[in-house]
Amino acid sequence: MNIKLNEEKGFTLLESLLVLSLASILLVAVFTTLPPAYDNTAVRQAASQLKNDIMLTQQTAISRQQRTKILFHKKEYQLVIGDTVIERPYATGLSIELLTLKDRLEFNEKGHPNAGGKIRVKGHAVYDITVYLGSGRVNVERK
């Protein structure tokens, strides 16, 4: 019965700890870069929400055969549909800048806007939302 312990191959405690510490350092490095990605997602979602709200206001004007409007303020925008007012506050760190659009966007009974123009949603990324006069078409573009 000869037992040879020295021929067993494996990792030492020092080698295992070294690999685990390198893996944890890499994970920390990866997860510290995620907040900017989250912030970019927040800006994209805010631009998408604003586009959807513009289209909702337009479609409601057509379906109810009444004028609807969106009012833009410094910290929020409001959808005014008949007697109903829906307030949408801007997320923290985001701002909405009216480039060529006035502080009020109205849709008539046929869904046509009273004015066309651009709105800029700014945060870690920048999105321009264009409302076209006449057709009322809404386009979102990342800058």
Curated annotation (Swiss-Prot):
Its main location: membrane. InterPro entries: ComGD, N_methyl_site, Pilin-like, T2SS_protein-GspH. It is found in: Cell membrane; Cell surface. The modification N-methylphenylalanine is found at residue 11. Keywords: Cell membrane, Competence, Membrane, Methylation, Transmembrane, Transmembrane helix, Transport. One of its GO terms (biological process) is protein secretion by the type II secretion system. GO terms for cellular component: cell surface; plasma membrane; type II protein secretion system complex. The chain crosses the membrane at residues 11-31. Pfam families: N_methyl. Processing of ComGD in competent cells requires ComC. Residues 1-10 form a propeptide. Disulfide bonds: none annotated. It is a single-pass membrane protein. Required for formation of the type IV-like pilus (T4P) that plays a role in transformation. Transformation pili are dynamically extended and retracted, perhaps thereby promoting DNA uptake and transformation. Required for transformation and DNA binding. The transformation pili are flexible filaments, consisting mainly of the major pilin ComGC and smaller amounts of the minor pilins, including at least ComGD, ComGF and ComGG. Interacts with ComGF. Interacts with ComGG. This is Competence protein ComGD. It comes from Bacillus subtilis (strain 168). The lineage of its organism: Bacteria, Bacillati, Bacillota, Bacilli, Bacillales.
